[in-house]
């Protein structure tokens, strides 16, 4: 019978050409069309089958596939638990097909015969087909029968193997180690996969466990696949996702009215904040400060908001000077604290200035962040001057100090304080060639601003004619372990550009540190902060000779005052830098001693080496009456006194 099938295949397709079956593998099969039996008879002898021979060739093709599968599945062996139904079907099919080739009986020309042949083949495939090579039983069925055949209703793994080889004809010649690896692995897999089998510990030592049938029945089929906990099937995540879905539905069904509301439209985007629950949203928003922190980008704060909740990942490691290895974690005072210290009449202008400054924070000149040393570096202030958006610290409403009141300065101060943490100017490390005065651990120490200092400064020395003591919140709020004073800028920029005398409204507050490091007066340019930490770059560097040269210290922001007199906090002033007597010639007296550095450095958190700054900056100030013993600095010595005109410094 197999030989006849092979001969038929050779007759039908000698050159292995594809059979002409326009609708193969479809149901119902196309109806055969034979106009006359003579034409069909003549076409059978042709080597290439025609379309009119289609039903016969289709049935033969199905029949040949059946024979080939049976030849592969060991046709000499009989199935284990099958009746002779398959052989009967096979014989019936060939009894129908062989006469059709020899005699061309008109039965095949009728659609009923072709449909019967196809139905018989389909029945063989569906109901009686063997799922495995040994028959219709699965591995689990064979294992179940093996365990049930044992007298104790339990078998070890090796006994199950032996039963397979003895009882199943397919495994008789597959008992050796080479050919049994595959099916034995399947046996072990099914034993552990199905819940119908249970493992019982063997009493004897060194013996394998017993495998028994589950007395509770168990599942006859496959149990669900066990998966590791992931984002998809984790119960905690599923609960949070369910809560998020409920909240999103509640938001969509809110007063704005279903899907027509903007919140519902944007909430359908899976990456939007509306599609996350509150638990996930905190982690979702925490990526910004970590990936865009100043410590990693060196481009200043990028987000136009004051983030009071940044963790240690945003702490700025500023200057690798001796002894400066700690992180500063104190933050800016909140908006409510600063607003409380301002005059009510100036609060509206303050908010307008803040809104204007928020649009100017993205650094237009990435080249300003490059490291540099010495006083010859081109000042980023000129780049800031060239870019139209770089005046975040010059309030638009401030024109001249002589026409401004104390509230105007407070507006400047608040704009400075609010934007100080978002300074667009990057930080720059001190040059390594700087003479480090305290090598190793011999530092003057980090001067700490106490927690109660803010409230104390808000209420101390608050004379009406003075600049507000709450400015100390701007100065003393800089990093909690640092004594670096960051005086706010002066609002008298325009008059100083003209060279005329004016009041210097910048602060030097000698009283606010209470015996700690004196807040060095820094030349302030009306644009940005000049932190004390950077004075040690080139204290004796540029002079006022060329107008820009005194301001070209690393980040000299006053370089735009070509030939002008940049305002600054003078140490010889009365501590607040106030009074009409503070004229331009007094400012010239100390301008060359106090270079302007790092004008855009954020004052929120940073480190500074107070010892190096005091040594490099204040020791060479000729007009400063400053008493400092360099021999004791190795032991963390604080300077005994720094004399100004009205205040004296006493070490704490």
Swiss-Prot record:
One of its GO terms (molecular function) is DNA-binding transcription factor activity, RNA polymerase II-specific. The keyword Transcription applies. Residues 362-397 have a biased composition (Low complexity). Coiled coil: none annotated. The lineage of its organism: Eukaryota, Metazoa, Chordata, Craniata, Vertebrata. This is Forkhead box protein O1-A. Residues 238-249 have a biased composition (Basic residues). Disulfide bonds: none annotated.
């Amino acid at each position: 019978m197999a030989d006849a099938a092979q001969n038929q295949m050779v007759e039908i397709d000698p050159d292995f050409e594809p059979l002409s079956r326009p609708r193969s593998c479809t149901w119902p099969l196309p109806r055969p069309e034979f106009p006359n039996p003579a034409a069909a008879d003549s076409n059978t002898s042709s080597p290439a089958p025609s379309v009119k021979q289609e039903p016969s060739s289709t049935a033969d093709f199905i029949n040949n596939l059946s024979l080939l599968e049976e030849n592969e599945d060991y046709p000499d062996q009989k199935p284990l638990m099958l009746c002779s139904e398959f052989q009967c079907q096979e014989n019936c099919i060939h009894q129908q097909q062989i006469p059709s080739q020899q005699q061309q009986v008109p039965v095949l020309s009728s659609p009923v015969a072709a449909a019967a042949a196809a139905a018989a083949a389909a029945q063989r495939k569906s109901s009686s087909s063997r799922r495995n090579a040994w028959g219709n039983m699965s591995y689990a069925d064979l294992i179940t029968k093996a365990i049930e055949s044992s007298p104790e209703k339990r078998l070890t793994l090796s006994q199950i193997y032996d039963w397979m080889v003895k009882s199943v004809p397919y495994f008789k010649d597959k008992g050796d180690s080479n050919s049994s690896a595959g099916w034995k692995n399947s046996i072990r897999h099914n034993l552990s996969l199905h819940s119908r089998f249970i493992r019982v510990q063997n009493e004897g030592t060194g013996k394998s466990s017993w495998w028994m049938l589950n007395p509770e029945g168990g599942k006859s089929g496959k149990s669900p696949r066990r998966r590791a906990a992931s984002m998809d099937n984790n119960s905690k995540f599923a609960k949070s996702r369910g809560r998020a879905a409920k909240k999103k539905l509640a938001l969509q069904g809110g007063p704005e009215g279903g899907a027509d509301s903007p919140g519902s439209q944007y909430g359908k985007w899976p990456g939007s904040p509306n599609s996350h629950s509150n638990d996930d949203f905190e982690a979702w928003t925490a990526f910004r400060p970590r990936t865009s922190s100043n410590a990693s980008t060196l481009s200043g704060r990028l987000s136009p908001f004051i983030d009071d909740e940044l963790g240690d990942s945003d702490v700025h490691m500023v200057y690798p000077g001796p002894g400066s290895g700690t992180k500063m974690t104190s933050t800016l005072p909140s908006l409510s604290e600063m607003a409380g210290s301002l005059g009510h009449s100036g609060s509206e202008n303050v908010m307008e200035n803040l809104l204007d400054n928020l649009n100017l924070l993205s650094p237009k000149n990435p080249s300003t962040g490059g490291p540099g040393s010495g006083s010859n570096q081109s000042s980023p202030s000129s780049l800031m001057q060239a870019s139209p958006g770089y005046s975040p610290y010059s309030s638009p409403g401030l024109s001249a100090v002589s026409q401004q009141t104390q509230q105007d300065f407070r507006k400047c101060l608040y704009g400075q304080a609010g934007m100080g943490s978002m300074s667009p100017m990057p930080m720059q490390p001190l040059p390594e060639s700087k003479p480090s005065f305290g090598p190793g651990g011999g530092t003057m120490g980090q001067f700490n601003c106490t927690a109660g200092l803010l409230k104390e400064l808000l209420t101390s020395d608050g004379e009406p004619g003075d600049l507000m003591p709450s400015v100390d919140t701007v100065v003393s709020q800089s990093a909690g372990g640092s004594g670096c004073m960051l005086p706010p800028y002066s609002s008298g920029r325009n008059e100083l550009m003209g060279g005329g005398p004016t009041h210097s409204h910048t602060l030097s507050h000698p009283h606010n540190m209470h015996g700690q490091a004196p807040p060095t007066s820094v030349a302030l340019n009306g644009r940005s902060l000049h932190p004390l930490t950077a004075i040690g770059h080139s204290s004796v560097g540029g002079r006022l000779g060329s107008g820009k040269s005194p301001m070209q210290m690393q980040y000299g922001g006053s370089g735009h005052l070509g030939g002008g007199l940049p305002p600054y906090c003078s140490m010889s002033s009365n501590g607040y830098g106030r009074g009409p007597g503070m004229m331009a010639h007094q400012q010239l007296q100390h301008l060359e001693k106090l270079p302007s550095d790092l004008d855009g450095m954020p004052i929120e958190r940073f480190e500074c080496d107070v010892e190096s700054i005091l040594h490099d900056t204040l020791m060479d100030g000729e007009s400063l009456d400053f008493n400092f013993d360099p021999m004791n600095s190795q032991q963390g010595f604080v300077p005994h006194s720094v004399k100004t005109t009205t205040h004296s410094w006493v070490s704490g």
